[in-house]
Each structure stands twice: as C-alpha cells, then as structure tokens.
Amino acid sequence: MTEIQLNMYHALALGAAMYALGLVLTKKLPVLSRFCIPAPLVGGLCFAIFNTILYATGTAVITFDDTLQTVFMIFFFTTVGFTVSIPMLLKSGKSVIMLLILSVVMIILQNVVGSGVMALMGKDPLYGLACGSIAMIGGPGTAAGIGPDLDAAGAIGGTTVAVAAATFGLIFGSLLGGPIARKLIVKNHLRDELAEQTVEEDVDDTHYNTHANNFVYGFLLLMFCAGVGNVVSVLLTNLCGFSFPIYIGSMLVAVVIRNVIDHFKIMEFPAAEISTMGNMFLAIFLSMALSGLKLWQLVDLALPMIVALAAEVLLMVVFSLLVVFPVMGRDYDAAMITAGFIGFGMGATSNAMANMQAVSRRYGPSPSAYFVIPMVGGLFNDFFNAAIIAFCIGLLA
C-alpha cells in the first residue's frame, strides 16, 4: 500500500483547509448547527473518512507530521489555565461554586463508569476514560488533545475512540437537555409556556473588543507559561512516578500567573485576547487531530463503546434529575441550569447555551442560568477535568 507522507507544514495547511471546509458545511447543513457540531470536527472527520476509504480499498494511506499539532494543543490548554481566576470564582456566588462541585463529581463518575464498563467487557480501562470525561465533559477539543496520551499509555486508537465518543456526546447532549428541562418544568409546575416566541438570544458567536498591544502581552504570557510549564511537567512526572500529559505544567503555570497578576494588579489581564488566541489554536489543532484519525481502529471496540456510551447517557440523565435539579434549588432556574449542565456535561458550552436558548424561547429567560453555566462550563470546568484525567491516566496506565 502506498504511504503518502505530509511534513508539518503540509499538515498545517491541511488543518487550515479542513477547518475552512467545516465552516462551509456547518453553514450549508442546518442539522450540524442545530446540534452545535464544531466546524473543525466536521472538516477533520471528512478527511478522516476519505483517508479510511483509501486505506480500506488498499489504495493508499495518508500520514503527516503532528509536531505543530502538539504545539497548538499546548497553547490551547495554556489558555484554559488563564481562565481560572480564584477571585472571580469566589465572587461569582454560591450557585457557581455548587455547580462546579457537581461538575467535578460528574467528571469522576463518568470516568468510573466508562472504565468499569470497559474492564467488565475485557478491554483496557483507559478506553473507558476515552468514553468518560475526556469525551463527555471534555468535548472534541479535550478528546483530540488528550487522546494521544491514551495512545502513549497503551490504549492504541485512544484518540479515535475519544473523538468518536465526543461526537456522540455532542449529539445526545443536544437531544436530551431541552426535553429533560421541559419535563422538570411541567412536572413541578415551574412556569407557564409563553404564548409566542419572545426571547432571541444569540448563542453562536462571542464578540470581543481586542487591542493589538494586549495581543502582544497575551502572546508573551502564553509563550512564557508554555516554556516554563514544560519544565514543571517534567518535574511533576519525576516527583510523582507517573507520566503527566505534556500540557499540564503549562496549564498550572498559567493559573499561577493569572492569579498573581489579578492579586497584585500588575496589569490589566488581556482575557479577551487570550480567549481569542485559545479559540484560534483550538480550531487548528482540532482540525489537524481529526484529520489524522484512523477510523479503522474502531472496529474491535464498537460494541464496548456502544455499551459504555449508553451507560454514560443513563448516568447523565439520572444525575441531572436526582442530583443537579434538587441541589440547584428545584425552581425554574434549576431546570434551566439542568438543561445547560447536560449540554456541557456531554458536549460543550455551546451545546449548553443552545439547550437553554431552546427552553427560554418556550418558557422565558433565566438570567441566573445564563450567568452560572458559562462560568462553570466555559471557564473553570476544563481545568478540573484535565487535572482529574491526568491523575486517572497515571493510575490506570
């Protein structure tokens, strides 16, 4: 079979092209937008399917150098660390802290359930992490970023499993959030249905006012944390006796730098600029990672994956109904938060916002939910998820 090898520059061009293709397809196919499927996922999977067809027919297989993919992944997770502002968390109120605690509990449960199912079916429990919080609460970005660590730990095809599971989560997170919230609202008589559609929040695009100088400051902070973080990752690995993901040190250094800047008021932190850079790095590295998926590796894991993902769906439904809704107050805001929790707990914050938008159009807005969900799902959640996943990989590898 002919092997077509792309160097890192070709791979970068491929990632950009697949991202552009994904943007076109998500605009042309409304069903993709409806389920909040990100453009890098769409474009990358298109190439992965094309490559799988070439492989299955014995025509050729396309491989590429993933050096820049790793660099962009580290940059992205470093920007995640910059979002963790402890003063902001303390000021955000009881609801945010309570939901963050519930989210951490869900991260642990998702990994226990996923690993348990895989172990019962005679597969490596590491594949259970791929079907657990890596894919569910983590979403496609975390799946593509952490998947290679599963491969390195011995779970061959871990990236492919994680991304496939994340795609499943995106769809079911969108399908379940609204109906479950409606069930809670109707059953508990929380609010009457609106006579007509009166709410028109736009949840698809986030707009920032950014400045060139702040971009420079933000990029310098990013480079510094990525460099120092590499040393921290090596030190942590040597001290703890098991391998940490390459990005974990950079993320921890970013947390420290962010909170030192906030505490001593050294400068106005360039949050908008760093968030924009994070979105850019995520889009390119995700497109590259998904383009490199070897979908033929899913064949032997199809049945265990189906069982594990079904268990994750059941876990989310039960936890949302019996824990999230009661703990958050059993009122309309709690029902709306439950819809959002299902969205980011099985996919991404964009799913959460889309779920809440659908509910609010029918029953009216919930300002509390629109504040709490982005704070937890968009700011703090990724950090705790990455830290717990790193521990679990070290434990199971």
Where are these regions (language model features)?
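Alpha-helical membrane segments and immediately flanking helix-loop junctions
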Residues: V117-G157, V161, F168, I180, ...
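Entry/N-cap segments of selected transmembrane alpha helices
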Residues: V71, S85-S115, T167, T276, ...
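Juxtamembrane and boundary regions of transmembrane helices in multi-pass small-molecule transporters
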Residues: G116-K123, A166-D202, L314, L322-Y332, ...
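Flexible hinge motifs at transmembrane-helix junctions and intramembrane kinks/re-entrant loops
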Residues: L25-L41, I53, G58, I62, ...
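C-terminal ends of transmembrane helices
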Residues: L21-S33, T79-K91, I180, I257-A271, ...
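Hydrophobic transmembrane alpha-helices of secondary-active transporters
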Residues: M18, L45-T52, D65-G93, M251-I261, ...
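Structural signature of hydrophobic alpha-helical transmembrane segments
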Residues: E3-A17, T63-F76, L126-S133, G241-V253, ...
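Membrane-embedded hairpin module used as a gating/binding unit in multi-pass transport
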Residues: M18-Y19, L170-H263
